[in-house]
Amino acid sequence: MLFNSVLRQPQLGVLRNGWSSHYPLQSLLSGYQCNCNDEHTSYGETGVPVPPFGCTFCTAPSMEHILAVANEEGFVRLYNTESQTSKKTCFKEWMAHWNAVFDLAWVPGELKLVTAAGDQTAKFWDVRAGELMGTCKGHQCSLKSVAFPKFQKAVFSTGGRDGNIMIWDTRCNKKDGFYRQVNQISGAHNTADKQTPSKPKKKQNSKGLAPAVDSQQSVTVVLFQDENTLVSAGAVDGIIKVWDLRKNYTAYRQEPIASKSFLYPGTSTRKLGYSSLVLDSTGSTLFANCTDDNIYMFNMTGLKTSPVAVFNGHQNSTFYVKSSLSPDDQFLISGSSDEAAYIWKVSMPWHPPTVLLGHSQEVTSVCWCPSDFTKIATCSDDNTLKIWRLNRGLEEKPGDKHSIVGWTSQKKKEVKACPVTVPSSQSTPAKAPRAKSSPSISSPSSAACTPSCAGDLPLPSSTPTFSVKTTPATTRSSVSRRGSISSVSPKPLSSFKMSLRNWVTRTPSSSPPVTPPASETKISSPRKALIPVSQKSSQADACSESRNRVKRRLDSSCLESVKQKCVKSCNCVTELDGQAESLRLDLCCLSGTQEVLSQDSEGPTKSSKTEGAGTSISEPPSPVSPYASEGCGPLPLPLRPCGEGSEMVGKENSSPENKNWLLAIAAKRKAENSSPRSPSSQTPSSRRQSGKTSPGPVTITPSSMRKICTYFRRKTQDDFCSPEHSTEL
């Protein structure tokens, strides 16, 4: 009693305005211990040890040392905690129920208590007289919790596994020998996310009728904040609800609506519940023991519904773990599933708790003596009850060390690692990592048959810019392909030039060429890779012509006269293709050839002389076909591109001026022989041909070949004259 008076002094204990004390009571927590005389085993009807489920200290004046304990067999025992002799400690016991008693509560200020059991009833007991004062009947399942208001002696509340909360009043008359509920909250903690809408409830009488059963939404704990306010928690919805008892919840058919709700503040995705609720002495702070191993502290007076503090370090895996506050509201104690009890300082929730060790099974119900800070009671599934006392530091006897069955320990602070980026090898990545390029893994690179020029295939994002090692054969083939592709002139330019060239060289009487255009002809030549790319468009045209065709210049003015051209005056071009040549045989010079052949029979001597003269002239070498050549050098010197160092005359296919001196002499002689002739001596065909002569000299390329008709000259009247006449001329 001296210690209690010291704690109540303002300078040492709780201050008048509230929380902290000048005296460091935190250091006293390590002095709690349990002697073997304070350890009590809970027995059943047959003397078999059974686990105790609930314990609570009396609130009657000068009777605060009385401890009531209920066990699984329905027995209630009263312990005098002032006596440390085991024989005198338990002074009274009786069998309150034929089933397990899950909770019990003292009537405020009196030696009376109410027990809530698994037989679906609550019983009202007079402890001093040892009499049953009444039975409360109305639940359809086990009762899990019972609570009294702070200043009410006749009204109490119970919550059961049927999901209902019932309010009882012992002042009401009994019917059939049982007390009936005066108020009821049905389905207090039903989940709101139902797949189908609930059926409308029928209006029920608030007294004596059986309520609906909802065992899946069990009410685990009820607690009074004041005379008109009730706080409750469920097993699976994770919501703490505050109810106003002045409202009649049975008068409506819809679901009951709480005046205030505290949603589950944790991070678990599983539906969790609360096993215990504790209010401080002022009723403004609520401590909720959740099955996610946390105790949440809520402010009941404000509008904020999130917790103001969280206590952790213990384990809570069942709904039998309870909590309690010290008489000065400075410390919070809770049972735990790891065979220990934990004590936290309320003002320092981050501080490691003090651990009470000594039990061998889960610690369920705990209670701090409301009038004595130095006394704590704990129940465990090891079938024992331990009363913890503060070591006063008196002289210890030699046998006291061996009689200690409970001791304290300071829990070490767990250092939580800061959030650090975990390497990808230790964590599952969000996406598959990109494979690193290596000589052995070359799947992103192109195959050997794929064109290797830039722009054919885009590089994948995971493919490095450097080339992957390949075999020498593959390297050589790729180099040759690159060389051949780079040496070819641009396709659009060559196709355009060839189409323009075909259009220019075509005449109204000529037919389109049989061979496909150069843009569609895809015949590769070995010489392609060896010919350098021309810088001018004319050079590209010449190279394109040399690859695709070997052309001949059909010149009509070979031996007759420099001014004489083709009979049709078209400067046509034929190919070295048999089919094309046969098709073009009658295009332009058919009439002229027939005339020459007809005249050839009249003058065989002169024509033979002319033919001999024509054949004696050295003809320029014909261009070498790129298909027949196997060399790797450039084209022969006589084959020069068109337009290089010369001027284009007449047609687009004209060649630069490169006259042969023998042909020049022959042409000069022909001019001298034909100059004295009179206009009357000329035939109409000759006059027609002379009128169609070109104004300038016609250039002959060394690489072009003469037409067959140019080897024969048309005979005139002068050719049939006598030799004397020709000598005179």
From Swiss-Prot:
Protein name: Denticleless protein homolog
Modified residue annotations for Phosphoserine: 409, 425, 484, 489, 494, 511, 556, 675, 678
Quaternary structure (record): Component of the DCX(DTL) E3 ubiquitin ligase complex (also called CRL4(CDT2)), at least composed of CUL4 (CUL4A or CUL4B), DDB1, DTL/CDT2 and RBX1. Interacts with CDKN1A and DDB1. Interacts with FBXO11; SCF(FBXWO11) controls DTL stability but DCX(DTL) does not control FBXO11 stability. Interacts with CRY1.
Domain of life: Eukaryota
Modification type Phosphothreonine: residues: 196, 463, 515, 683, 701
Species of the source: Mus musculus (Mouse)
UniProt xrefs under PANTHER family: DENTICLELESS PROTEIN HOMOLOG, LETHAL 2 DENTICLELESS PROTEIN RETINOIC ACID-REGULATED NUCLEAR MATRIX-ASSOCIATED PROTEIN
Membrane topology: Peripheral membrane protein
